[in-house]
């Protein structure tokens, strides 16, 4: 399955919520009616979505938020199921601990896609070493930094300025002057978006 390269607003409308695929400088406009699915043109459907349909939609939504493909997502779920604790919560923690997501949470990328691109282009250091694998799992205490040759990129400065206007997450710390941050801890469930119902995903894979 290839990555979706079409309009981001269309995906947000399909899932009925902002997937944070667009940066704050190009946020979803008022014209993007999230309560209207693509092709509805304002009309509502008389059919109800089945339990399976709701579960599938929730999985698709989370995959799109984190930019993960189906095979990868299944591996994350299998790993979450293998570990002790709440499977759904562990799944989200694994996704939040991806390097591209941590780069995004630290404000170095205005979207996860932009953060993923920074990693793929070797613009990121992990504990002082250059890396280019977005899916690397970051551990508590790990230091993520912008490589010297990438520090002058305007998009990084713009992204940090935008993040400064929003509430920062508490489980990472960022030194803006040094363009580096520390992954302090794996986030608790309450630190992760409440727009996700991970129990539906667990139900889907338990069928």
UniProtKB/Swiss-Prot annotation:
Bilayer-spanning residue ranges: none
This protein's name: Small ribosomal subunit protein uS4
Molecular functions per Gene Ontology: rRNA binding; structural constituent of ribosome
Top-level lineage group: Bacteria
Ranges where the record places region Disordered: 31-56
Pfam families associated with the record: Ribosomal_S4, S4
Bias (Polar residues) ranges: 42-53
Record's compositionally biased regions (Basic and acidic residues): 31-40
Sequence similarity: Belongs to the universal ribosomal protein uS4 family.
Subunit field text: Part of the 30S ribosomal subunit. Contacts protein S5. The interaction surface between S4 and S5 is involved in control of translational fidelity.
Organism name: Polynucleobacter necessarius subsp. necessarius (strain STIR1)
Record Gene3D superfamilies: Ribosomal Protein S4 Delta 41, Chain A, domain 1 (1.10.1050.10), RNA-binding S4 domain (3.10.290.10)
